Amino acid sequence: MILVIAEKPNVARKIAMALAEVKPIKKTLFGVPYYELIRDGKRLIVASAVGHLYGLAPKNDFFGYPIFDVEWVPVYIAEKGKEYAKDYIKLLSVLSKRVREFIVACDYDTEGEVIGYTALKYACGVDPGVAKRMKFSALTKRDLIKAWYNLEPTINFGMANAGIARHILDWYWGVNLSRALTHAIKRASGKWVVLSTGRVQGPTLKFLVDREREIQSFVPQPYWVIKLIFEKNGKKYTANYEKDKIWDENEAKRIVLEVKKAPARVTNIEVKQQNRNPPVPFDLGTLQREAYSAFGFSPKKTLDIAQSLYEKGFCLHPDTLILTSQGVRKIKELSREGEVFALDFNLKLSKAKYRLLERDADEQMYKVTLLDGTELYLTADHPVLVYREGNLAFVPADKLRETDHVVLVLNKSARDNYGFLDLLLEITDSQEDYAILENGETLSLHSLKMLVERGEIKDIAVVGFSHNNFGKVMLRDELWYLIGYLAGKGGEIKGNGVVISSRTKEIVGLTKSLNIDLIETEEGIVLSNKSFVRLLHLIHYTPRVPEVYGIINNTEWLKAFLAGYYDATLLEGLTLEALYKIKVYLQLLGIRAKIEDNKLKVHLEDLQRFRELLGKFSRRKLYVETSQVPVFTDFDERSYDFPRILGGDIYIIGIKSIEKFHYKGKVYDLVVENYHNFIANGIAVHNCSYPRTESQKLPKNLNYKFIIQNLARIPEYRPYAHLLLGMPELKPVEGKKEDPAHPAIYPTGEIPRPGDLTKDEALLYDMIVRRFLAVFMEPAVRETVKVTISAGKHKFFISGGRTVKEGWLRVYGKYVKFDEVTLPTFFIGERIKVLQVKREKKKTKPPARYSPAAVIKKMEDLGLGTKATRAQILETLYQRGYIEGKKSIKVTPLGMKVIETLEKYVPEIISVELTREFEKKMELIMEGKLTKEEVIEEAKIRLTKILEEFKKKELEIGLELAKIVVGEEKPPLIVGKCPKCGGDLIVKYNEKTGKRFVGCSNWPKCNVTYPILQRGEIIPTNKTCCNGAPVVIIREKDGREWEICLDMNCKEYNTIKKKR
């Protein structure tokens, strides 16, 4: 048995669903889920961590410093609030005793490797070197299966060691320096006050302090500005003096006098025009920043709204048949991720990855019936690809007209590069399954797969298949005829054979050539061959259902399978689902058909093609009913879409009827990468787009025109859409950032109905739509005018700016701020009517404080922290009381004093260079050029020297910090007088456990202590009880009060007398 360890519970579920040959069995232990499944004859258990299960803690904690002797302990011991991890550790510990092999399937990065390493070593109690590694970059079924068949022999010890080193260094720095500061205050004041700093926290606080010092040390300087106020065309205007600031008041006075005496004239006019290019498409970060600027949305709120827009409606009935790379499947039966067929920009069939969406519906749906009998059930807002008014466009169901024509798939080019070897390697690599080679040799598919993946075998002919060397089945195209025939006849798998009701001439002779025995029994005719039965299981053979894995990828196989199914059924008496599947398969062979009177009728024009393609394999005279399928052909040859329609893998059918009905139940949709459409019941429909992206590039194959045509139906976007549709070419402006998994954020073209979107969703949708339209538009042209007015030797300037060509600003200008200042017409030599020469006194201003966003940006620029840690570091600074203010960050006196102390005694710890130096060493560990032991030892040496110097000055440091810290502390709560020495009995807290107790203020000279309840407010009563012990009231949150004596032996204490 094998234990697969994932990083998080949801990832464990996805891995289990992907690897299971049948649905995995979900179990729970200690309230934690795990999964059992079979893969290639092997039993697997897929379980998970929940992030880091282990953290660092000192082996022998004396609460002193320096301390370097650390060990990995359960994270709930190392950190408060992580108790939930205990059950995950217990689960892995129990499961590890039931298995012999281990596979790490955590995220493939340093943290993922540390999580896997520590889970193996401490929870499972095994050497991490014995585990194999699943390496994947996406959680699609295809990627996970590929990772399963390409296991790394071990975990990546370079990444694991680098991650372990980083954890240890961060612990060394954070814990030792925090303890040093805390001990310094204790030595100086006798108070335990916890202060903290660290490798990244220190440098971050340092640059905030630097800004605060700039502000505090800033001395405002007076200066004067001079303005020339004049009148032109009945309006007042202001021109500014050529010097921004005049530092001498007397000079300012002199200038004013000289200007007043001299006539003012226009001496120069400078006009410039600049192109302002359109903005690039939205990545998530840019969308978040602009939404904050325009609407005040937080980044989290923007992401939530974008996710909501992404998942809004656009859904299909659960029985909708989807054309996948494995065959035609009901959408409700699809795995969460996989591969479907889609139409590319040129309307050619292509394959693309999908992700399944599911939601509950209680709403109106639409039944769209085409003239060829095809039916499709959609929610009101799910778009269908239609030909309308000479153009192709995606139109939601509730906007469809009966005059519209719908696009269906029709494969016009065979794709036969998929062979038996490809099929066998996809469905199994079991040690018990064998391929029979052309020379008669047998080779296990497991070994064969490894040889192919290593490139040692590139071209090999496979002629047969064997399971456990119990017989063999020959692999020829005719095999698919037999499988199709058995499916049509309802052949049931029983034991090592397939049973049909009676012998038929169609398969006599064929079974013999395929090495399958025919045996007559009381039940009927048995096709006996263990290897054949094994193959049927692997390709998901089901009686009476025209569907097996693999046939869709090879047209010869598809022809043979359909011929066999036809010979067995004559296409009569079939279920509607079977008819639909056969209709889609015929479309993939380039044959159009019609469903009428519960029968499948081939298009009269395609009858000859039907007979030619299936006649190659059929053993009967092919007779099939025909009908004139009303294919639309009246295309506008001037249309932009005409060449693509003519050469595409499609045909177009009119709509017969559109009916509404109410539906309550599950509905589904797909998110399809790159092509953003898929084939449902043979019809091209749209999908959703994905908001979590770092890309500033639109999909290469995206049909921009489709989307813009749909957006033109919204009145407020119509003028801009029509402008773009009139352009000879739609070419977007794009940015440099690219996300290999997801394109930039853009509107899909589905049109929201009134009431579909909330107010906030509507705001964000408007911004996304306008940004999308803007990237296709022409640059804006801005004109600036600078007029020089001279009065004697003195010059004044007045400037204006205006947009002379709107370009993209026409659609996106509401989210861009440009000052529009239009000046009157001036002429060189024109005399200016001066109303006033004004002198104003001003003062210089200090630099602005950082905002939270500016802090994150500064950390990025300095290389401090990571995307995952920067926000938390800033939050820690708030929690420690080092900074305050949510919009404008101010460093508190405590924060200032901590940095002042670190600068004076341990300047290295707040050095950006030190942080960068050790980050470089982490990279060298990963590359195998340094060992983690070398880096950790160097860190110990560096830190030891720092702390040795710190200890020499510990008292001075403590005295400096105590002035701030102790002054801010609340006075201790006095509950009475000590019966032994007369000192104050005060509430204290254990430095290790944090638990409270009552003790004498004269400790350590007096050791009187009392225990006390850990919950509730303590209220002194000024009363005493046994042996002079004080009596106090404990008030709970619900208002109840308890009067108790603090003496443990007091009867009153033992009964806890309730006070009302």
Curated annotation (Swiss-Prot):
PROSITE patterns: INTEIN_C_TER (PS50818), INTEIN_ENDONUCLEASE (PS50819), INTEIN_N_TER (PS50817), TOPO_IA_2 (PS52039), TOPRIM (PS50880). InterPro entries: Hint_dom_C, Hint_dom_N, Hint_dom_sf, INTEIN, Intein_C, Intein_endonuc_central, Intein_N, Topo_IA. Its cofactor is Mg(2+). GO terms for cellular component: chromosome. Its EC number is 5.6.2.1, 3.1.-.-. Residues 1-141 form the Toprim domain. A zinc finger (C4-type) spans 978-1006, 1025-1050. The active site is at residue 690. Mg(2+) binds at residues 7, 107. The record marks 52, 166, 170, 692, 880 as: Interaction with DNA. Keywords: Autocatalytic cleavage, DNA-binding, Endonuclease, Hydrolase, Intron homing, Isomerase, Magnesium, Metal-binding, Nuclease, Protein splicing, Repeat, Topoisomerase, Zinc, Zinc-finger. It comes from the Archaea. It catalyses: ATP-independent breakage of single-stranded DNA, followed by passage and rejoining. Monomer. Belongs to the type IA topoisomerase family. When a topoisomerase transiently breaks a DNA backbone bond, it simultaneously forms a protein-DNA link, in which a tyrosyl oxygen in the enzyme is joined to a DNA phosphorus at one end of the enzyme-severed DNA strand. This is DNA topoisomerase 1. It comes from Pyrococcus furiosus (strain ATCC 43587 / DSM 3638 / JCM 8422 / Vc1). The gene is topA.
